[in-house]
């Protein structure tokens, strides 16, 4: 029985030895399991350890079975050659063990090594040196840290090259740039547009169309593009000014009676004279004979209906006459927005839009709203630090000029809005004719038609500046 078992045991030992030899590297005490030391490689723990170049080591016959490799005192180029020749290599150790190994500071070799599928098990102990000579801030880096810096530099260099290529192209658009420091003018002034003849569909029938590109025009069209009908700059300017003036007038609506003017609609009842108002005549309900108001816009001469106000001004009464002051003609007379020379011209508005596109401001308002476009200029003025982002001095001066013009127009429109609001209040509500007389006494411009004074009982008209109002002709108050 023992004689049969012994050959079997020997067979197993021989098979195991041959198997261990075939799965190089394998830790063993027998030198025959590893390459000869004289060739520059042998086994060390679970690694095949080499200290000579791949050509000298002569391990080509074992290259398919080597999965772990330790290289001693070799240059990075030789390490890369080992990795390229060993297809099943999984891990590599760079030594000698326990001692920092220094490689030349080369991004190409380090990135190639770190980008391979082979893992460097002691990458934190491997350093590159001589980096100051290559323009780095330090002379020595660990391999992992240097690989990270190389990737970062590569990204920056490729991005810079792409940016230079983009800026040199003919279709460069200033509105697509990431920073205003790159300038406010595109590299190319013209765009070559190839339009193919749709009728024939032949490549030889392509025609070249050259058109000037205006970045500010494109910016304006971009903002207005989602609307069904694009508006011109003049339309936007007109709407902006009209909307702003309307809001100023609304804001002044709560100040009736200010600025030395009497409260609109607050005239006294008939027969009760009050200082600053024209006499309204006898109390309503009595039917005296009344003369027609001077100007011809009132009721016919005779007795007005019971309860009807007497002495209505032009267009001011709810029942008498037709609208007068406050119409389009008066708006044209008293509003400075009608004058062509006092509006923001299209050129200045184009410059403003160019700056908005160049500074890439996060707009806090809807630029499609004409009133908000005015708020945007106010936002620029109140946040003057935004001007520091405009690198072009000429463009910065243009923005400052536009801001100054806008501020002056806001002040003028505010005054016009208050004035128009007072004028409208003079011709609305009860007692408007009396308020008109007080407004005239305060130096307001004359109005067409309207009552020139109160009425006496029996149809006897008072002094043309009658009532208890101030007469600007004499400088004294007249008692009716």
From Swiss-Prot:
Maturation propeptide residues: 21-247
Segment forming the signal sequence: 1-20
Pfam families (UniProt xref): Bindin (PF02084)
Region feature Disordered, mapped onto this chain: 161-211, 452-480
Topology versus the membrane: Single-pass membrane protein
Localization per record: Cytoplasmic vesicle, Secretory vesicle, Acrosome membrane
Transmembrane segments: 431-451
Skewed-composition ranges (Basic and acidic residues): 197-211
Region span, Fucose-binding domain: 377-385
Keywords: Cell adhesion, Cleavage on pair of basic residues, Cytoplasmic vesicle, Fertilization, Membrane, Signal, Transmembrane, Transmembrane helix
InterPro entries reported in the protein's UniProt record: Bindin
A GO CC term assigned to this protein in UniProt: acrosomal membrane
A single GO BP: fusion of sperm to egg plasma membrane involved in single fertilization
Note: A.punctulata bindin forms multilamellar structures reminiscent of lipid bilayers.
Entry's family note: Belongs to the bindin family.
Role, per record: Species-specific sea urchin sperm protein required for adhesion of sperm to the egg surface during fertilization. Bindin coats the acrosomal process after it is externalized by the acrosome reaction. It binds to sulfated, fucose-containing polysaccharides on the vitelline layer receptor proteoglycans which cover the egg plasma membrane.
Record's protein name: Bindin
Organism field: Arbacia punctulata
């Amino acid at each position: 029985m023992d004689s049969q078992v012994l050959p079997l045991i020997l067979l197993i030992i021989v098979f195991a030895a041959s198997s261990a030899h075939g799965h190089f590297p394998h830790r063993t005490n027998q030198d025959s399991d590893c390459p000869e030391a004289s060739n520059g490689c042998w086994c060390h723990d679970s690694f095949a350890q080499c200290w000579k170049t791949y050509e000298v080591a002569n391990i080509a016959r074992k290259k398919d079975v080597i999965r772990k490799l330790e290289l001693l005192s070799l240059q990075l180029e030789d390490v890369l050659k080992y990795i390229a020749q060993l297809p099943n290599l999984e891990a590599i150790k760079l030594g000698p063990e326990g001692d920092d190994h220094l490689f030349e500071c080369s991004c190409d070799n380090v990135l190639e090594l770190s980008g391979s599928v082979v893992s460097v098990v002691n990458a934190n102990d491997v350093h590159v040196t001589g980096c100051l000579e290559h323009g780095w801030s330090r002379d020595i880096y660990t391999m992992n840290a240097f690989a990270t810096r190389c990737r970062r530099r590569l990204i920056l260099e490729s991005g810079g090259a792409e940016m230079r290529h983009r800026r040199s192209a003919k279709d460069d658009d200033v509105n697509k740039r990431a920073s205003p420091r790159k300038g406010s003018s595109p590299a190319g002034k013209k765009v070559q547009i190839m339009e193919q003849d749709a009728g024939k569909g032949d490549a030889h029938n392509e025609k070249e169309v050259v058109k000037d590109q205006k970045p500010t025009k494109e910016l304006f069209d971009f903002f207005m593009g989602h609307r069904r009908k694009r508006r011109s700059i003049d339309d936007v300017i007109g709407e902006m000014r009209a909307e702003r003036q309307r809001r100023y007038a609304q804001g002044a609506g709560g100040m009736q009676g200010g600025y030395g003017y009497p409260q609109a609609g607050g005239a006294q009842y008939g027969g009760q004279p009050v200082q600053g108002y024209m006499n309204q005549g006898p109390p309503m309900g009595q039917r005296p004979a009344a003369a027609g108001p001077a100007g011809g816009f009132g009721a016919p001469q005779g007795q007005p209906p019971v309860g009807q106000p007497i002495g209505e001004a032009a267009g001011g009464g709810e029942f008498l006459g037709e609208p007068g002051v406050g119409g389009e003609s008066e708006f044209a007379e008293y509003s400075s927005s009608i004058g062509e020379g006092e509006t923001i011209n299209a050129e200045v508005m184009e410059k403003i839009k160019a700056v908005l596109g160049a500074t890439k401001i996060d707009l806090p308002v809807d630029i499609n709203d004409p009133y908000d476009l005015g708020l945007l200029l106010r936002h620029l003025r109140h946040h003057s630090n935004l001007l520091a982002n405009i690198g072009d001095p000429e463009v910065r001066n243009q923005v400052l000029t536009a801001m100054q013009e806008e501020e002056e127009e806001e002040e003028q429109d505010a005054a016009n809005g208050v004035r128009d609001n007072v004028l409208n209040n003079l011709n609305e509500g009860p007692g408007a004719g009396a308020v008109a007389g007080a407004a005239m006494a305060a130096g307001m411009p004359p109005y067409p038609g309207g009552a020139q004074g109160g009425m006496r009982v029996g149809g006897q008209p008072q002094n043309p500046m009658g009532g208890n109002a101030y007469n600007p002709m004499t400088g004294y108050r007249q008692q009716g």
